[in-house]
Amino acid sequence: NGNASVLDPVACEVILRFFMPTHGKRVYNPFGGGVQFGFVAGHYGFEYVSSEIRQNQCDANNAICQDLPGPAKWIKSDSSTYEPLQKVDLVFTCPPYYKVEEYLDYDGKPPAGELNSIPTYEEFRDTLFAGYEKAIEALNDNCFFVVMTGDSRDKNGAYYCCEAEHELFFKERGLHVYNKIVYLECEFTRLAHAKKTLNYR
């Protein structure tokens, strides 16, 4: 798939099981992207709504998820201004890492407001966090906001420190950093599985 990142559906299921309240039923994803989390949530009967800036991604995901037990819906919108219509019991998102991937619509171009087309990291961060602000407003009390994120590097090879800024952002808004999960994909730890590959001369 051209090295595009794909969210692991098993990780989606684990996150739902760990962080959805016992009687929770609604999930909001402010940066929708691919179908995986919505499909898993809908399969288990949860209500899932996502803000997604690309019409082609919305159409593809909505077609895949139209017959699930729970409604899963991607809405063409800008996350920095979109407000969910109902309170939610879990916010999950896996937003873009700055300047790592390209997100295009039907016309082969990034839609206006697409995060990775924003010229500076600071503008990217502020737009990303504006989307988080809207999601926090929709989140019920004593519920989790789960972000799967990573860092990227500037032209000098230095980290932007986006992960650290995430933690400060949420703490400044009264949320608590409850847990950190390091996610290792099997593809990148394959060498450790095959004993002979570790025998060097």
Residue ranges and their predicted role:
Residues R153-R201:
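Class I S-adenosyl-L-methionine
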